[in-house]
């Protein structure tokens, strides 16, 4: 997770959120991570919740929140679609690394094999990196909106080491 705030706020760390209003989206893992970091850092901030990511970003954009804590790709997409993208930035430390997966029935070994083989082939051929670049780095038609989120080292590592680990394995230090 990253925090996104007004570009001139000077917020660069969760430790600087003491006494601030921090937005996140109801029902997301960001809520859990935010509370864990709040306790661990001894920081006291007020959590404000949006019912969806657009509403959470609006809390930030309208000044009702000082930061919005969410996945980097969601933050980048909201920034790209905002009225004034240069007013916002992704700032601060990554609060967690979470895997993204394809959900399917547990007993469908044939479908799992197709999914695994396809993703492995896309990763090894470089096509997966090209698709990422197309949707997260390059302008997206028809409005040529640019999300501007370069592939992270964690994502590159995930592509190089495809696995079936549960999310809990990523939280271990």
What is each of the regions a protein language model found here?
Residues 1-3:
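Short, small-residue-biased leader/transition segments that mark boundaries at the very start
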Residues 5-22:
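Flexible hinge/capping segments at coil-to-helix
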Residues 9-12, 47-62, 96-98:
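Short helix-initiation/N-cap motifs at beta->coil->alpha
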Residues 10-13, 30-34, 53-56, 71-75, ...:
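Stable alpha-helical elements in mature extracytoplasmic
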Residues 17, 60-61, 102, 115:
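Hydrophobic residues within well-ordered alpha-helices
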Residues 24, 43-52, 92:
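Short beta-strand-to-loop elements that line the ligand-binding cleft
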Residues 33-40, 59-62, 66-96:
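A ligand-binding cleft/hinge motif common to bilobed small-molecule-binding domains
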Residues 97, 103-173:
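An extracytoplasmic/periplasmic, membrane-proximal ligand-sensing/linker region
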């Amino acid at each position: 997770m990253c925090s996104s705030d007004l570009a001139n706020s000077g917020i660069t760390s969760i430790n600087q959120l003491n006494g601030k209003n921090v937005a996140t989206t109801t029902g997301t893992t960001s809520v859990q991570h935010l509370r864990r970091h709040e306790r661990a850092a001894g920081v006291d901030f007020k959590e404000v919740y949006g019912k969806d990511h657009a509403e959470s970003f609006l809390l930030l954009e309208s000044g009702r929140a000082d930061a919005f804590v969410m996945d980097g790709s969601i933050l980048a997409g909201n920034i790209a679609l905002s009225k004034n993208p240069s007013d916002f930035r992704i700032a601060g430390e990554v609060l967690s690394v979470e895997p993204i997966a394809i959900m399917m029935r547990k007993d469908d070994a044939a479908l799992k094999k197709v999914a695994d083989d396809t993703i492995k082939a896309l990763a090894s051929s470089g096509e997966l990196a090209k698709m990422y670049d197309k949707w997260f780095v390059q302008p997206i038609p028809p409005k040529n909106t640019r999300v501007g989120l370069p592939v992270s080292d964690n994502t590159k590592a995930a592509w190089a080491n495809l696995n079936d680990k549960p999310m809990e394995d990523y939280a271990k230090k």
